[in-house]
Every structure is written in C-alpha cells, then in structure tokens.
A protein has these predicted regions:
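N-terminal catalytic or cofactor-binding beta/alpha core of small enzyme domains
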Residues: 1-130, 134, 147, 154-158, ...
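C-terminal folded domains that constitute the principal catalytic or ligand-binding module
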Residues: 137-138
Length: 437
C-alpha cells in the first residue's frame, strides 16, 4: 500500500509529526513498522482544510493529512477523523459533500494512538467536519491538539508518527455513526474495544438536518455495512426520524452490545444470522459465542421452561457456559434471552445436547432437584405469608427475615423458615437425561 502524508508549511503540529515520521523512516528497522507499505511526503503552502484535489499530486493509495487540532477546551488530545460537510462549508470544502473515508486504517490508527499515547493525552475520533472534500482516494486526518504547547510537543509528534507507521487493520466492520459531541465518545470506545470501525460520524446537532441522500452518501463514502446510533445523545424526535430513514433505506442498525459481541464472523455471515433471528422473533438481537467457520446456519430450539429455570438460577453462569460453544444466542430488544439458538446445520444434535447439559448442570447446582428417567424435577421452596400469619408472625421485618432464611422469635417461640414455607415441583422432560453427569 502506498501512503502519502500531507502537511502544511503553516502548521506546527503537522511539521512536528512530519519530522518524526522522517526520522523513523530514515532510521530504518522493520521490527515494529507494518510491512508492505511505501511512503511519500507532500507539503503545501495553504491550510490543509483548503487542499482540494491533493490526491492528484501523488501516486498513492491513501492520503493521511497530519495537522493541528484547535479547541476552546485546550485538552491535550490525539485525534483522527474524515473530512466533509453535512451542511454549509464554513471551514473548507463544499456544502453537503463528504470525502472518501479510509475507515479501516483510521480505526487502526486510533487503536495505535491509544497504545503510543503520551501521558496526559487522550485519544478519540472527531466527528466529520471541514475540508478538503474533493478527493478520489480514501483519506483521513490525524491531529495533535489543542494548543501551541501540544502542537510542538516532541512526545506527541513521535507518538503520532509511531502510530500511523505501525497501525494494523484487524478484520474491521465498517460503520457510520450518529450522535454525540465533537469527540464522538461512544464511537471511540466502540472502535477501541471491538471490530467496529467508523467512517463518517454525524454530530448530534447535524442529525436533525440529515436526509436520506446524505445518509446514503455517508454509507458509500465510508464503505459501511451498518449504522450505529448513540441513542442517549439524541432527542426522541430526532431518534425516531433517523430510525425511520435507516429503515427506509435498508441500512442495518447495530447497538453497541451487538457490535461488541460480533465475534470473528465475517459481516455477510453475521448479517445472515441476524436475518434468521429476525424471522424467529421480529427485532431479535444476536450475540455470537464461539461460532466460526462456514456452512449453512440453522435455528435450534431449546425447551423454554428449562432455559428459563437455568437463567433464573444463574444467568451469568449460563452466559459463561455459552462462551465455548459454536452458537449464537438470541435476545429480545430489552435483552431477555430467547429459547432459540443458531449454529451450524451439521451441529444441531451436539448443540442441543450441550445446551441441555449446561442448563441441567446449572439448575442442579442451585436448586433442589431429582431425576426420574428423562424427567428433571425441580422443587421450589418459597416463603408462605399465610403460614407465617398462622404462626402469629406480623408482616414487615419478620417476613423479610424469614424469607431470607433466618428464624425469628415470636412470643418466646422460634419460628424457622421451614415452618412457614411451601413447596411446589416443576417437571421438565429432557431426552437422554439419565446419561447426563
């Protein structure tokens, strides 16, 4: 891959980064630099936000603009972002025009910045803003902010130089983002902790003005496959309007938890599983565990009573148990697990057995159980308020104490939890239960 670094003679931060890039490249040494890349440098007189068509001056595959970030908050920061204007062109470029984003490389650089970040600095995306936009090649800005002190800081310049030279793209899922402040906090966190890589990101204040044409442009210029919305950053009206446009344009929408739980599935396979889940239960979310490889996928039902009892007994333990299984679990929009799992078509019998075994193991460890052939009998013992009243126990703290398994003293008598409890049985038929250890 051919990479062109673009800087301005007007800019101290760009000069700082350029100096350290040249030093590192002149020093050689391939132990930490990403292999298979060549580099060239372009220096211009104008501010980079006005450097339209800069990619026409170089034989390159990627444009990385090195520049300063200025902010009234004066926070020491290292940032990446792609350029474009959702509305007017107040800072270069043209109105309603977006530049092509180097989405995967931008995420790789962000993650590398987090690794090399000097003490006292933070790293983040910035939302899409300013020019240039007249570019045919993928591009992004990497910046040092936010004052002259940081722009000329050798540690910051070296960190950025090391980061862009060592950045490695790692199976990203390209996304567009909506909502948040200038520093796109949620999108930054997602990109640092998952495969989610953002191209164009629209600030909260831009969302109300977006139309379907601009959303399609965000997708196309980012090479994105889905969208993420920072729901807490939008008011209800803007959220509903945006959600409607995404639905109309057929753009998949992912929640943060879905992005974090995609596993290593290729997007096409993940999307196929998502569509399968939606046919099982409209709007169902999916969470990938150790499902890998290729081949047809199929839904596998699990006894809903068995699953429900396992979840009530120990939901975190059940989730941990799924981690090693080649399955996807389904959940409702409010994150209640559904009694259907997705796995490879040729794994169904093994997965049914594994899921049954996991449920039974958890229930037996937490509940009073008995086994009769293929029947699992769960005995539920509960505090019975009526029995407590018959023993003269007044409602209130004594009820709570007995329900918590502690005896109480009433008029010199000890009332134990067993005296005021009732039991009931739940019987579940599980084929092959006698063979479970």
């Amino acid at each position: 891959m051919k990479v062109a670094f673009v800087s301005s003679r007007q800019d101290k931060a760009g000069g700082n980064i350029r100096h350290h890039l040249m030093q590192l490249l002149d020093a050689g040494g391939s132990s930490w630099q990403e292999q298979g890349r060549t580099y060239e440098f372009i220096e211009v007189d104008e501010r980079l936000i006005h450097a339209e068509g800069i990619d026409k001056r170089a034989d390159t595959d990627l444009i990385i603009s090195i520049w300063r970030h200025a902010s009234v908050t004066t926070v020491p920061v290292l940032t990446v972002h792609v350029t474009g204007n959702f509305r007017e062109a107040d800072l270069g470029g043209t109105p309603r025009t977006l530049a092509p984003a180097a989405t995967a490389m931008m995420q790789a650089t962000l993650r590398s910045l987090a690794k090399h970040c000097p003490e006292g600095y933070r790293v983040s995306y910035e939302v899409t803003h300013h020019g240039p936009v007249d570019l045919a090649l993928p591009s992004f800005f990497v910046e040092i902010g936010s004052t002259d002190k940081e722009w000329t800081d050798p540690a910051a310049g070296l960190a950025v130089a090391q980061s862009v030279l060592s950045a490695v793209m790692q199976d990203p899922v390209p996304l567009i983002g909506f909502g948040g402040t200038h520093y796109a906090a949620r999108q930054t966190e997602i990109a640092l902790t998952s495969r989610g890589a953002f191209g164009h990101i629209a600030h909260t204040r831009e969302v109300a003005m977006l139309d379907e044409a601009m959303i399609r442009a965000m997708m196309a210029k980012s090479g994105a496959v889905a969208a993420y919305i920072d729901r807490k950053a939008l008011n209800r009206e803007d959220l509903n309007r945006l959600s409607g446009m995404l639905a109309t344009t057929g753009i998949p929408r992912l929640t943060e938890s879905e992005i974090l739980s995609m596993g290593h599935l290729p997007w096409e396979r993940y999307h196929a599983a998502r569509e399968m889940a939606d046919r099982v239960s409209a709007g169902a979310r999916i969470y990938v565990h150790d499902l890998q490889g290729t081949g047809p996928l199929t839904p596998v039902p699990l006894d809903p009573v068995l699953l429900g009892e396992a979840i009530k007994a120990d939901e975190p333990g059940f989730i941990r148990g799924l981690a090693a299984l080649p399955v996807i679990h389904l959940a409702t929009q409010d994150n209640h697990m559904l009694p259907v799992f997705i796995t490879h078509d040729d794994h169904t019998s093994q997965i049914i057995n594994a899921l049954n075994t996991l449920c039974v193991k958890i229930i037996r460890s937490k509940e009073i159980t008995a086994t009769e052939k293929d029947l699992l009998i769960i005995t539920k013992v509960r505090f019975d308020p009526e029995k407590a009243r018959e023993f003269g126990v007044p409602a209130g703290p004594f009820f709570k104490q007995l329900a918590g398994g502690q005896p109480v003293e009433i008029d010199g008598r000890t009332i134990t939890p067993g005296m005021v409890s009732s039991s009931s049985d739940i019987t579940i038929h599980i084929p092959g239960l006698e063979k479970f250890s």
